[in-house]
């Protein structure tokens, strides 16, 4: 009775197997153990199967051995990365995964069956991810007497991630600890507040982010500035900008002045004064040789003179200015005015000729002058 009880207990333990938990870092290699003694009697009926239940409860087959064939490309996520680690026919059906990925995390089950006997084991695999390289930032103005916040954070990595700030020694005698007036935000360990900055607070600070898989770090430099020096720099920059604007304005005024002088010089010969005297007409006494020809053209000259009111008025003044002597015939004068270039001859209408004939008939002195000539 006692022997049967011991055999039953041993069979029960062999059937249920064991539960094992393994932690590995991503991109590394892992071997999940599974041992049995069911393949020795009959190898043809041996069946081995590895199953994965992920964190969401979904189950899938990883690798199997059946009918003397191995099937290890059953899932697209683990294709080419899973295999039996040793001689599974001799009793070592351990599973090897390389390289590890975060999606490989979950509960693995090894089932071995042969001739009605079976055994299985369970392995819980946790894939750890190293923290990504953190990003160090400064919040605030690094001026003397003010407060400055150092910010450090990793974008990815297995939780929890621990942050640690320290000062890097650049010179002999510098302290590696944070300044005395520094406070760590325990709700967010990646933030450190540096209060009441002094020139001694300047230096290089390093933040380290770490977890079970590893650690990464970043550095940032703090340069504390005097408030007076900032004012002087701002004043100097303002003065330089103002000076540059003034020089530009002077150059612009000079160019504008030269352009204006050049324009005045070009337009000066074409100016017309309003108080300038009009060109004077002069009277020319015709010679005896040309009197006949002028007499023949008297009609047309009279016609043209009547067409121009200004010429007619000047001729009348000339006639009055030259008094006639008794017994002598009046002399004919021709009005010579300033030469007009580029002027076209005016057209004389029929009505103008009619008016001219009427004027000639009503002017006795002018008619007598033409008759005498």
Swiss-Prot record:
Q: How does it sit in the membrane?
A: Single-pass type I membrane protein
Polar residues compositional bias, start-end: 364-373
Low complexity biased stretches: 287-313, 321-332, 353-363
Supply the gene name: Clmp
Which PANTHER family does this chain map to? CXADR-LIKE MEMBRANE PROTEIN
Induction pattern: Up-regulated in mature adipocytes and adipocyte tissue of obese animals.
Residue spans of biased composition, Basic and acidic residues class: 263-280
List the source organism.
Answer: Mus musculus
Source organism phylogeny: Eukaryota, Metazoa, Chordata, Craniata, Vertebrata
Q: Which residues lie on this side of the membrane: Cytoplasmic?
A: 256-373
What range(s) does the Ig-like C2-type domain occupy?
Answer: 18-126, 134-223
Protein's name in the database: CXADR-like membrane protein
Query: Main subcellular localization, coarse class?
Result: other
